[in-house]
């Protein structure tokens, strides 16, 4: 990580992967983070990255339903967010983050039901997935050897089919992808 000044970090990653005998295109990613306030450890982060994904062996060959004609997914993702961390050593620690993201993916692989009663993957020409993710983690010391840990997250993730209809009866263009939840939340303790 390059730090042009003490509170700012910049990272550039260039990645290429081999899948069988085929190489991915170069997959760049740029990450920037900056400390806004040392009190509360408030940090702003942003990134831009290229996405590329080969179909999995299940996508291609699962029986029944695999689709050996699938194309590779590719696209770009942008995100930005804030994080914080506060606490008192040996007493408690609270961490949280809020992140906005925006992805434009071509040939998104989605498993859909068939008329034969099983699911099969298909490529969705253009998908726009965007939203926010909120995370929080709390640790509280209850006694000398006891600690309570709670963490949770909430995601709002519209994933919209912006491609072309796959058939004359396809009414999914402009709508949320099926089997991809728009809202999700978890709490663990």
Q: What are the functions of these language-model segments?
A:
Residues 22-26, 92-93, 146-148:
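Short glycine/proline-enriched turns and hinge-like loops at secondary-structure junctions
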Residues 22-28, 57-63, 107-117, 157-171:
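Outer-membrane beta-barrel translocator domains and adjoining extracellular loop/strand segments
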């Amino acid at each position: 990580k390059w730090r042009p000044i003490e509170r700012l970090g910049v990272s550039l990653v260039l990645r290429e992967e081999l899948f069988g005998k085929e190489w991915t295109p170069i997959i760049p990613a740029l990450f920037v983070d900056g400390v806004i306030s040392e009190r509360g450890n408030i940090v702003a982060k942003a990134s831009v990255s290229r996405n590329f994904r080969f179909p999995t062996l299940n996508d291609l060959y699962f029986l029944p339903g695999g689709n050996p004609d699938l194309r590779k997914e590719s696209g770009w993702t942008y995100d930005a967010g804030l994080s914080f961390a506060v606490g008192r050593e040996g007493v408690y620690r609270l961490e949280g983050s809020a992140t906005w993201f925006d992805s434009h993916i071509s040939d998104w692989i989605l498993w859909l039901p068939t008329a034969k009663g099983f699911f099969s993957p298909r490529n969705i020409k253009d998908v726009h997935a965007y939203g926010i993710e909120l995370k929080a983690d709390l640790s509280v010391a209850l006694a000398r050897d006891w600690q309570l840990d709670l963490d949770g997250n909430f995601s709002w993730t519209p994933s919209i089919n912006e491609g072309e209809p796959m058939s004359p009866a396809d009414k999914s263009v402009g709508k949320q992808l099926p089997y991809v939840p728009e809202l999700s939340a978890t709490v663990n303790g």
